[in-house]
């Protein structure tokens, strides 16, 4: 499997905008190459049930499936990987518990990016590229900060934070392997169409 290729258009769920299952189905129809289930403060059983359904859907569309934060849920639903932030389980511990999971690390600076790569992350989610409503306290690194990270690490980098169809091109031109979006897809009236538009831009720039 070519991980870089599978990270091109990475769509993250947000139940404040849309229920998970239907929106993920539409995003996959629109060409999402990876899905991350991001559910904060839900019972583990609920996360497990939704995760199982999303795992099935992503398999049907040959997309990668990641779970945010929860290594246990990722293992239970047979996800491809887990996304870990600075306050989540340490990367090296997750690798020990779940050696077969693809580990993505959320990083907000060049220092954090280098540290995550050293600890064994398989790819980075780097941002926030622009200010974002989804995470109002996010540190903004801008296109320049993103470019520095891309130039300094060997592992794939996915850009995140305030990315939409209007700025996706300039983000992709920094050399990233893909873009991660929440509001640009989950906040759209037509999830499938919004995903298709972004996929078209991704293909134009990355091929």
Curated annotation (Swiss-Prot):
GO CC terms, sorted: cytoplasm
Recorded superkingdom: Archaea
Keywords per UniProt: Magnesium, Metal-binding, Thiamine biosynthesis, Transferase
GO molecular function terms noted in the UniProt entry: magnesium ion binding; thiamine-phosphate diphosphorylase activity
Binding positions for Mg(2+) per the UniProt entry: 69, 88
Keyword Magnesium annotated: yes
Enzyme nomenclature, EC number: 2.5.1.3
Catalyzed reactions: 2-[(2R,5Z)-2-carboxy-4-methylthiazol-5(2H)-ylidene]ethyl phosphate + 4-amino-2-methyl-5-(diphosphooxymethyl)pyrimidine + 2 H(+) = thiamine phosphate + CO2 + diphosphate; 2-(2-carboxy-4-methylthiazol-5-yl)ethyl phosphate + 4-amino-2-methyl-5-(diphosphooxymethyl)pyrimidine + 2 H(+) = thiamine phosphate + CO2 + diphosphate; 4-methyl-5-(2-phosphooxyethyl)-thiazole + 4-amino-2-methyl-5-(diphosphooxymethyl)pyrimidine + H(+) = thiamine phosphate + diphosphate
Positions with a binding annotation for 2-[(2R,5Z)-2-carboxy-4-methylthiazol-5(2H)-ylidene]ethyl phosphate: 132-134, 162, 182-183
Cofactor(s) needed for function: Mg(2+)
InterPro entries named in the record: Aldolase_TIM, ThiamineP_synth_sf, ThiamineP_synth_TenI, TMP_synthase
Binding site for 4-amino-2-methyl-5-(diphosphooxymethyl)pyrimidine: 36-40, 68, 106, 135
Cofactor note: Binds 1 Mg(2+) ion per subunit.
GO biological process annotation, one example: thiamine biosynthetic process
Keyword Magnesium listed: yes
Pathway linked to the protein: Cofactor biosynthesis; thiamine diphosphate biosynthesis; thiamine phosphate from 4-amino-2-methyl-5-diphosphomethylpyrimidine and 4-methyl-5-(2-phosphoethyl)-thiazole: step 1/1
Database matches in HAMAP family: TMP_synthase (MF_00097)
Function: Condenses 4-methyl-5-(beta-hydroxyethyl)thiazole monophosphate (THZ-P) and 2-methyl-4-amino-5-hydroxymethyl pyrimidine pyrophosphate (HMP-PP) to form thiamine monophosphate (TMP).
Family to which this protein belongs: Belongs to the thiamine-phosphate synthase family.
Name of protein: Thiamine-phosphate synthase
Organism: Pyrococcus furiosus (strain ATCC 43587 / DSM 3638 / JCM 8422 / Vc1)
């Amino acid at each position: 499997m070519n991980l870089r290729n599978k990270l091109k258009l990475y769509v993250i769920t947000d139940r404040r905008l849309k229920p998970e299952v239907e929106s993920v189905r539409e995003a996959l129809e629109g060409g999402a190459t990876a899905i991350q289930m991001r559910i904060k403060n839900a019972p583990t059983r609920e996360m497990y049930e939704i995760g199982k359904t999303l795992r099935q859907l992503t398999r049907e569309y040959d997309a990668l499936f990641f779970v945010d934060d929860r290594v246990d849920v990722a293992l239970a639903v047979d996800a491809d990987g887990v996304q870990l932030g600075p306050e989540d389980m340490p990367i090296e511990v997750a690798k020990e518990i779940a050696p077969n999971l693809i580990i993505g690390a959320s990083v907000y600076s060049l220092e954090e990016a280098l540290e995550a790569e050293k600890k064994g992350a398989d790819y980075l989610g780097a941002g926030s590229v622009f200010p974002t409503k989804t995470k109002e306290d996010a540190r903004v690194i801008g296109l320049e900060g993103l470019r520095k990270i891309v130039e300094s690490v060997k592992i794939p980098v996915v850009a995140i934070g305030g990315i939409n169809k209007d700025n996706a091109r300039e983000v992709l031109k920094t050399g990233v392997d893909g873009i991660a979006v929440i509001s640009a897809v989950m906040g759209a009236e037509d999830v499938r169409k919004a995903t298709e538009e972004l996929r078209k831009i991704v293909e134009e720039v990355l091929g």
